[in-house]
């Protein structure tokens, strides 16, 4: 294989598009001109004129055959159709973009010498007319990362800050300080290149430890952070600038809701099977209505706008949901109504520790005023299928604490949980507590093992509840990598009886 350098790149002389030739074509993908002095977007500076070969077929029937049998010879640039209409309403095919069209020799001969044998054969048979045209690739042609590589002072494309998360119509960036001079340009390009995006914002401060919100700067688009987000089959409406929402946690939301629903479904199936057996044994014309089954109660301590609570309510889980942020609480109540789960999700606006300490009392008060609820799925039941109403239970099966920066520091509030209401016995089932938390390590340190991480997290738990947990009885689920030296986990454990029945404590 012989190579020569053309426009700074090696080019195979082979007439057949081999693996090396295809590698070359990937290398010689057109790129916008460098504009490293630009800090304000000027869309006119990104036009590139590309010389292309156009093969006009007198008989259009050859076009489909040529495209099918000679794919390596046709143009394969995104958003450019290789079939073109000519001035006389005929049809022509653009040939691959890496053909060398420079030099004084005849264009047709030069092109034919670079095509595959089958391509040359078909073009000759069809008596195709080959000419050279100029195609302008303007700003609209380039992807966002190509524009950024053209403008930003980077040497590698993996350094480009092109990643963002979507929350409704808002693109959320977290730009490093080095891109401050380019932030408006970056925002405008993201707005231009993503049709779903109407607003681009950048995080300008660290997350507020009280409400988990952060200050944001609108870089491009509408100054509107009122969004609608769809997740887990639910609709969520909120002001992204005033509440906490992380789209990267949707898998974790689904995981825990599925866990809760799985346990509840198992219990409900057993109840329905028992009722079916009783009906069969009695053989009466009138079906025996099954006894009510206790609902599964979930306590969401840091509920936000409802990503755990609302999907849980849609699956007939009974949820007592709380958030301290008044804007989150307002959005939570709105989303509960929006998704028609008001019977299953009750909302509160309290401090997390105060809410945990009052949670059993709040549950008891609710079950006294509304002891029974109808399942959400009743409307979908089959004809003849018995209606299984649900009783509000006297205890929670699960507590969710999704405040990873400090949730562990709230665990002390579980002390004396079962001493706050009357009527509980030592046999009352204990809840499972699911605590989200961060674990980080210093620069220069090796990433800790799973065992080391769990030990460190359980030591933090011990300092709050004064009871050592058996590592083998504690689940630890890796949620996501927050930064190179920081991971997010969810640790799950059954609340020890010594904690639930301990004297209640108060911290100022």
Swiss-Prot record:
Keywords recorded for this protein, A-Z: Cytoplasm, Methyltransferase, Mitochondrion, Nucleus, S-adenosyl-L-methionine, Transferase, Transit peptide, tRNA processing
InterPro entries hit by this protein: MeTrfase_TRM5/TYW2, SAM-dependent_MTases_sf, TRM5-TYW2-like_MTfase, TRM5/TYW2-like_N, tRNA_Gua_MeTrfase_euk
GO BP annotations listed: mitochondrial tRNA methylation; tRNA N1-guanine methylation
Enzyme class: transferase
One Gene Ontology MF term: tRNA methyltransferase activity
A Gene Ontology cellular-component term: mitochondrial matrix
EC number of the protein: 2.1.1.228
Transit peptide location on this chain: 1-53
Ligand binding (S-adenosyl-L-methionine): 253, 323-324, 351-352, 402
Subcellular location(s) per record: Mitochondrion matrix; Nucleus; Cytoplasm
Region annotated Disordered, chain positions: 267-291
KW S-adenosyl-L-methionine (keyword) present: yes
Basic and acidic residues bias locations: 267-284
Principal location class: mitochondrion
Catalytic activity: guanosine(37) in tRNA + S-adenosyl-L-methionine = N(1)-methylguanosine(37) in tRNA + S-adenosyl-L-homocysteine + H(+)
Record's subunit section: Monomer.
Its job: Specifically methylates the N1 position of guanosine-37 in various cytoplasmic and mitochondrial tRNAs. Methylation is not dependent on the nature of the nucleoside 5' of the target nucleoside. This is the first step in the biosynthesis of wybutosine (yW), a modified base adjacent to the anticodon of tRNAs and required for accurate decoding.
PANTHER family recorded: TRNA (GUANINE(37)-N1)-METHYLTRANSFERASE, TRNA METHYLTRANSFERASE
Record-linked HAMAP family: TRM5
Family: Belongs to the class I-like SAM-binding methyltransferase superfamily. TRM5/TYW2 family.
Protein name: tRNA (guanine(37)-N(1))-methyltransferase
Gene it is expressed from: TRM5
């Amino acid at each position: 294989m012989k190579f020569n350098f053309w426009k700074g790149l090696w080019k195979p002389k082979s007439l057949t598009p081999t693996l090396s030739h295809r590698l070359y074509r990937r290398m010689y993908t057109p790129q916008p001109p460098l504009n490293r002095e630009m800090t304000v977007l000027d869309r006119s500076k990104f036009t590139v004129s590309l010389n292309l070969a156009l093969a006009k077929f007198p008989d259009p029937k050859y076009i489909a055959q040529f495209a099918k049998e000679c794919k390596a010879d046709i143009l394969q640039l995104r958003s450019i159709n290789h079939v073109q209409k000519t001035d006389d309403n005929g049809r022509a095919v653009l040939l691959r973009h890496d053909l060398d069209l420079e030099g004084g020799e005849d264009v047709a001969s030069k092109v034919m010498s670079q095509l595959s044998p089958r391509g040359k054969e078909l073009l000759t048979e069809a008596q195709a007319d080959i000419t050279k045209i100029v195609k302008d690739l303007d700003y609209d042609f380039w992807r966002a990362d190509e524009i950024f590589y053209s403008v930003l002072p980077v040497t590698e494309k993996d350094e480009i800050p092109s990643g963002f998360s979507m929350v409704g119509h808002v693109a959320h960036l977290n730009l490093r300080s080095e891109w401050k001079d380019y932030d408006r340009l970056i925002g405008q390009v993201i707005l231009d290149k993503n049709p779903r995006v109407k607003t681009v914002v950048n995080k300008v401060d660290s997350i507020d430890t009280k409400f988990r919100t952060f200050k944001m700067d609108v870089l491009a688009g509408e100054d509107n952070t009122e969004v609608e987000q769809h997740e887990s089959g639910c609709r969520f409406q909120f002001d992204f600038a005033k509440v906490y929402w992380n789209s990267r946690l949707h898998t974790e939301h689904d995981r825990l809701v599925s866990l809760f629903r799985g346990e509840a479904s198992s219990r409900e199936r057993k109840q329905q099977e028992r009722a079916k057996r009783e009906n069969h044994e009695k053989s009466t014309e009138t079906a025996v209505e099954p006894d009510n089954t206790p609902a599964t109660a979930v306590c969401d301590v840091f509920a936000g706008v409802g990503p755990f609570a609302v999907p849980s309510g849609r699956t007939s889980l009974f949820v007592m949901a709380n958030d301290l942020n008044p804007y989150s609480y307002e959005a939570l109540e709105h989303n509960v109504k929006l998704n028609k789960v008001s019977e299953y999700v009750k909302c509160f606006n309290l401090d997390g520790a105060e809410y945990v300490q009052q949670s059993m009392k709040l549950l008891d008060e609710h079950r006294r005023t509304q002891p029974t609820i109808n399942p959400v799925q009743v409307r979908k039941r089959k004809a003849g299928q018995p209606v299984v109403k649900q009783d509000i239970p006297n205890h929670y099966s699960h507590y969710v604490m999704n405040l990873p920066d400090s949730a562990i520091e709230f665990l002390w509030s579980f002390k004396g949980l079962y001493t706050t209401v009357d009527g509980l016995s030592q046999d009352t089932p204990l809840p499972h507590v699911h605590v989200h938390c961060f674990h980080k390590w210093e620069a220069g340190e090796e990433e800790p093992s799973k065992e080391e991480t769990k030990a460190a997290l359980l030591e933090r738990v011990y300092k709050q509840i004064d009871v050592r947990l058996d590592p083998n009885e504690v689940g630890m689920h890796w949620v996501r990598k927050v930064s190179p030296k920081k991971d997010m986990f969810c640790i799950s454990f059954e609340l020890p009886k010594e904690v639930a029945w301990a004297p209640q404590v108060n911290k100022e």
